[in-house]
C-alpha cells in the first residue's frame, strides 16, 4: 500500500511539475520578447560557448613575443575574458597579486558592492573552493579560484566535489614546480599534479607558453560539465615555435621529425617543453631525428579518438622520453616499458630555480 501511494503521489507531482515548467517557459518567452537586450545577456550567462566566439579571432591569441610566466599570461586572459563573459567572477586565497587573478576595473565584491567581480576569500583555500561550488550550483555565473599549486592539497576535497557534481569551476594554480626556487620544498609541488590527474571528470592543463595558456582558458571558459585546473609557472618561459590551438586536443606534435618514423619521441608539459625543444636540437647535431610532443592535458588527450592518438604517439616508435619537473607518476602509459621518464625523484630544495633544474637532471645533456 505504501509503495502504491508513493507512486500515485509522485505521478501527481510529475503532472503538476510539467504544467509548472510550461508556465515558466511561456513566461520566459514573453520576457525575451519584451527585453531583447536582457535576453542576450541571459544567453551569454548560461551558454558560454555561444558567447565566446573567439576561436577564429586572432586578437584572442595575440601576445608579445617575449618570455613570460604562464601565470602572467593567465592574468592577461582573465582580463580579456572579463569583457567577453560579464558573468566571470573569482579571486584568490589572499594571493591575487602573485597568482595574477585580479580583474582590472571590476571592483571588489563586498556587502556594499554586490556588483564587484573580484572576490577576496582570505587564507582559507577549502572554503574558497566550496564557495565557488555554490556559485556554480546556483547557475549563471562562471567562478574561478586561485592559489599556489602546493596548496591544492587544501582545495582538493572541494575540487573533488566540483568533479562529482559536474560543475565548471576553474582552478588557477601557480608556482607549479621546483621553479618556485628559494621558497624551498614546502612550497614546491611534487605529487599534486598526479593527484589532480587521477581525479575523474577533472581536466588539468599545464601550458607551456602564451598560445597554450590561451587555449587552456578557452577550454575552461566553455566547459559545461567538468571543472578545469590551470597549472602555471612562476618563472618566465619562451614563446614556442609550433605552439598550437591543438592544445584543445590535450596533446599535439609541437615540432616534428623530418623522418616519416621518428627516431624517438620527447614528451613534455609546461616549463619542460622548452627543454624538449632544446634536446631535439642537440640530438639533431648527432644525427638523431626526434619528434617533440607537447602534452598540456593528459585528461583531454586520453579522450581523443585512437587515430589521433596514434598520429601523435605512433606505436611503431618505442623510444620515448617524458619530461616533467614533478612526480613521474602516470607517465608510464605514454612511454611504455622501453621508455624513460625524467621527473622529480623526491622533494625539492631551496636554491635559485636554475640551479634546482640542473641539480635534479632537467638539462639537455641528461635528456
List where the protein language model places each region.
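Thiamine diphosphate
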Residues: 4-5, 12-366, ...
